[in-house]
Amino acid sequence: MRVIIAGSRSMTDAEQVAAAIACSGFAITEVISGGARGVDTLGEAWAHMHRIPVRRFPADWQRYGKRAGFRRNEAMAYVADALIAVWDGSSPGTRHMIATARQRGLRLFVWQPRQAPDHHRRGR
């Protein structure tokens, strides 16, 4: 399963990202990443540790300006089967990624680190 691992840039806790991945239940065969600091790069590191291929979609800020992150999210959602979002509840980029994944019909797992595991949301 091709899975986007994305989330808040302020997240620096690799254990939280690994927990989100484990709790998602997704059988990941490829990690799709936007390459941003925080969750994206922690997800890439997890993939490398587990010998899972990573496909990066860096935002083209020079070409698209403020819309670059949103365009990247849309491109990732086009090739993915699912999204694991580790979200602080306020990041607009992660909010957009979640909305885009829902719109495209991807399987969805949202992990909010301050919540207990039974409060994590699964959706389609």
PLM regions: where:
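Acidic/glycine-enriched connector segments
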Residues: R2-V3, R9-R122
